[in-house]
């Protein structure tokens, strides 16, 4: 199987350059200013982890994954997002990459437009500052930076710019070798349980990395979390949040599936 990250990087290096030809950065910034996005407040992603001992579920609106292919090509954020909010999601994660996740920036924009009050996590393979302006324009509360895709200096620079634009930063780690990236100043740490170069999953990665992370950092885990028992084990290991998408999206009613999952977490707890 071709190295997933190699394919991602090859695609992403082209994508921002194409967007810049269509809407140059100066023009995009002008649109952001004109629409008042710089002054418009967004709910804090970090704050959802305050004041509760129960692990929080960030529900993901995802129509496609590299591992599963298309899950639901016709899924609508206006339906799923509202149901997620109704059934207890702490925040909503929205992958905006089309090639690998079938996503668009418009999903984030629509979630804002229909009045979803939860923080929105803009997930993409961000390697260029242009993408941060796209996230701001869309209405994101927070963005994900992936350590393995960036140099330490790139990560610091993108983190600083995201903060200037009023967005929080979630730093995604795959291995202990990336712990140097804590120096970037991200607001939260996301441990991805997938092996970076394959589809293999190992939730024990989160537990191992949790022991190496500072006690006061907010820790979120994603990938392979398919039972409330696993969710509570992660909580015991020091995680305050989990991101779950395809488990819910594969069901006829993702919101109800989320609600049942949260109920079971509390029972197990």
Which residue stretches match the model-derived regions?
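Structural preference for beta-strand elements that scaffold enzyme active sites
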Residues: 56-60, 91-93, 119-121, 141-144, ...
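Active-site mouth loops of central-metabolism enzymes
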Residues: 61-76, 119-127, 170-172, 220-225
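An N-cap/entry alpha-helix motif that binds or orients negatively charged groups
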Residues: 1-72
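Glycine/Thr-rich beta-alpha phosphate-binding loop at enzyme active sites
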Residues: 63, 67-74, 83-102, 181-210
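Short loop-to-alpha-helix "cap/lid" segments that border enzyme active sites
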Residues: 105-116, 129, 150-157, 176-188, ...
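Catalytic cores of alpha/beta
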Residues: 127-139, 174-186, 221-244
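Glycine-rich phosphate-binding active-site loops on the catalytic face of alpha/beta enzymes
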Residues: 94, 134-154, 191-200, 239-258
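C-terminal helical cap(s) of enzyme catalytic domains, especially alpha/beta-barrels
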Residues: 209-212, 250-269
């Amino acid at each position: 199987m071709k190295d997933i990250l190699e394919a991602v990087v090859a695609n992403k290096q082209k994508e921002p350059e194409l967007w810049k030809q269509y809407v140059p950065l100066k023009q995009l910034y002008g649109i952001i200013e004109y629409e008042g996005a710089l002054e418009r407040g967004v709910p804090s992603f970090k704050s959802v982890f305050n004041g509760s001992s129960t692990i929080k579920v960030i529900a993901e609106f995802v129509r496609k994954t590299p591992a599963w292919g298309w899950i639901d090509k016709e899924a609508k954020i206006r339906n799923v997002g509202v149901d997620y909010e109704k059934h207890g999601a702490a925040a909503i994660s929205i992958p905006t990459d089309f090639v690998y996740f079938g996503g668009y920036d418009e999903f984030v924009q629509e979630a804002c437009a229909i009045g979803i009050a939860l923080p929105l996590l803009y997930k993409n393979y961000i390697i260029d500052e242009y993408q941060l302006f796209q996230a701001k324009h869309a209405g994101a509360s927070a963005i994900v930076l992936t350590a393995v895709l960036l140099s330490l200096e790139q990560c610091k620079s993108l983190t600083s710019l995201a903060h200037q634009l009023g967005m929080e930063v979630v730093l995604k780690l795959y291995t202990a070798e990336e712990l140097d990236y804590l120096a970037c100043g991200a607001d939260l740490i996301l441990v991805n349980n997938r092996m970076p170069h394959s589809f293999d999953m190992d939730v024990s990665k989160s537990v191992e990395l949790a022991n190496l992370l500072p006690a006061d950092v907010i820790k979120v885990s994603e990938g392979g979390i398919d039972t409330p028992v696993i969710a509570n084990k992660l909580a015991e290991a020091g995680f305050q949040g989990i991101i779950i998408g395809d488990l819910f999206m594969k069901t006829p009613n993702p919101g109800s599936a989320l609600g049942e999952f949260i109920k079971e977490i509390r029972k197990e707890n």
